[in-house]
């Protein structure tokens, strides 16, 4: 049986792949700490936590139950349409970044718990964990506007 490596691997069949970072680990831009990607992630992955990056080295941590490429497409739409409700779009437009500057990679696949449970809640908990671990909150550290810890109650 061959080992399937963890990491980010573009499918090369969609337009979102041009912005995906192919990696097995990533380094925090301010602390220099290295983290390993948890799971094999492509733009077709579901139930994953992901990071968006920009040239300013600010990060946005998000989650999606849908295919990752669908969520990235929504971020790009928000940027193109100057959506003021999106912290990512506001930053990209105020900093005059282009869509080509957007980079993303998956951080972790959230699998169904072995003994059952609420996968959606676990996904939200893992997003909160990564927002905190990577210190991606606005205004100085990142592009996340809020981190809701009620998912742990």
Language-model-derived ranges and their functions:
Residues 1-153:
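Charged structural interfaces that engage phosphate-rich ligands
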